[in-house]
Amino acid sequence: MNRLKEKYLNEVVPALMSKFNYKSIMQVPKIEKIVINMGVGDAVQNPKALDSAVEELTLIAGQRPVVTRAKKSIAGFRLRQGMPIGAKVTLRGERMYEFLDKLISVSLPRVRDFRGVSKKSFDGRGNYTLGIKEQLIFPEIDYDKVNKVRGMDIVIVTTANTDEEARELLALLGMPFQK
């Protein structure tokens, strides 16, 4: 069993139970899924850019991403409906915990001038979104093979009803929030 999942079951659940006075263990918020999205704007002019993005996302997530397509045509961006413009991957279960563990303990500390992640990025429904400016912070990405620095969005979806519960859950799991 994953180290983070073990920590969740043995330490986080009892701590949250006592803090928020839940009646049942099923009320304790848990992480449902993690969605990693990579928008590749230059895929419009250069379709090969998408292939490298998909490859990098596969390495990062350990799972093959799905290619996202344009919903509408936008003339200003020379975009037609249905053109591939990005990639996203949804992690659940073991892979999700492995990714989160790696993100918290290895990748985030590698960000330049890292002072912690923002406390304001909750959406009011107990989900947390975090943007990453470059994919090089992940240990799986080989610096020499990268042709372009790309960012990505990471959404952590929890079953928490309020932001406060979600913040507490992530903080207990080790998410480095700003002081």
Curated annotation (Swiss-Prot):
Give the matching InterPro entries: Ribosomal_uL5, Ribosomal_uL5_bac-type, Ribosomal_uL5_C, Ribosomal_uL5_CS, Ribosomal_uL5_dom_sf, Ribosomal_uL5_N
Q: Which GO terms describe its molecular function?
A: rRNA binding; structural constituent of ribosome; tRNA binding
What's a Pfam family in this record? Answer: Ribosomal_L5
Tell me which GO cellular component terms the UniProt record holds: ribonucleoprotein complex; ribosome
Q: What does this protein do?
A: This is one of the proteins that bind and probably mediate the attachment of the 5S RNA into the large ribosomal subunit, where it forms part of the central protuberance. In the 70S ribosome it contacts protein S13 of the 30S subunit (bridge B1b), connecting the 2 subunits; this bridge is implicated in subunit movement. Contacts the P site tRNA; the 5S rRNA and some of its associated proteins might help stabilize positioning of ribosome-bound tRNAs.
Q: Which NCBIfam families match?
A: PRK00010.1
Q: Which family does it belong to?
A: Belongs to the universal ribosomal protein uL5 family.
Keywords attached to this entry: Ribonucleoprotein, Ribosomal protein, RNA-binding, rRNA-binding, tRNA-binding
State whether it acts alone or in a complex, and with which partners, per the record: Part of the 50S ribosomal subunit; part of the 5S rRNA/L5/L18/L25 subcomplex. Contacts the 5S rRNA and the P site tRNA. Forms a bridge to the 30S subunit in the 70S ribosome.
List the lineage, top down.
Bacteria, Bacillati, Bacillota, Bacilli, Bacillales
Q: Does the keyword section mention RNA-binding? A: yes
Q: Which residues form a coiled coil?
A: none
Q: What is this protein called?
A: Large ribosomal subunit protein uL5
Q: Name one GO biological process term.
A: translation
